[in-house]
Amino acid sequence: MPTALDLVAEEASTCQRCKLADAGRTQVVFGMGDPHADLMFVGEGPGAEEDRQGLPFVGRSGQLLDKLMLEELGITRDRVFIANTVKCRPPGNRDPEPDEIAACRPWLEQQLSLIEPKVVVTLGNFATKLLLETKEGITKLRGRSYPFRSGVLIPTFHPAAVLRGGGEPLAQMRADLVRAKQALAA
């Protein structure tokens, strides 16, 4: 029997709420993982490989995320839920536009409500600004935990930014994931 999250994913699979539906997407990338996860990651949007496979974070950024989850949290992706701010790939991997983020927000809100994670880790500016409802950037916001719903939100860098930036962003992302581990244990 399909779960409530499965039903929302099925409904989202035919979404036409914004122009991304007709911008060359292969499919909606709804999210993946444990529907009862205590930890949820929220990124920006699917890239080319994610669009092809229909799964979030399967390219180089996803490989880094998987590696850091295992090293810093001791868990694998099947024990978390991974979603994005927008569910369709923006053309040319451009940033999602405000109207696209707004059109997709109800899908993310339903995911958050149904999964009820104890800890949400936002990956990068778009997810962080949306869920914290702020204009501040990730560089100012990361390094702390924020009350969020019935748990906490921990902002960190997007893995793609870490791949580009190397040393210091990687060390900071590791520290943020340690913070997530501590919040899960609390």
Which stretches of residues belong to each language-model region?
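A polyanion-binding, active-site-adjacent surface
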Residues: 1-186
